[in-house]
Amino acid sequence: MQNTQRRDFLKKSSAAAFGFTLLPSYLATGRSGEGKQPPSKRVNLGCVGVGGRASGVIPSVSANGAATPVAFADVDFSARRVDANLKRYPGVKQFADFRVMLEKMGKDIDAVTVVTPDHTHFPAAMLAMSMGKHVYVEKPLTHSYR
């Protein structure tokens, strides 16, 4: 077994450290140079409910760039409560009915957020899950299991 000298160890470890500084970060992390996920690895979100609590949920879910809203469903896009998300995500398609959103954009949606009044969680979440979508839903899912 070869006895490693301190000088040789320092040379090799310095060379390795220098090599890693030249390696582009997106090769090591799998992210693009801007720190965003490439489109093939990004989760496309369909968002049911855009105002109120959704003003905090949607940005939180998409904050790290791994998820991007592609469709919004809300019953009233003229309400002030939806303005924050409409300004934050300007090109997102809008639907007044979540069923229409899932029917028309189902192939483009990977996951669904359901952030609506409690009594409306179940229909939206169950339809999305029946289509094989991953779902983030606020509790409770329903008021009763009967």
Description of each model-found segment:
Residues M1-H134:
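N-terminal glycine-/serine-/threonine-rich beta1-alpha1-beta2 phosphate-ribose binding loop
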Residues L141-R146:
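Rossmann-fold NAD(P)-binding glycine/threonine-rich loop
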Residues E138:
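The substrate-binding groove and active-site-proximal loops of carbohydrate-active enzymes
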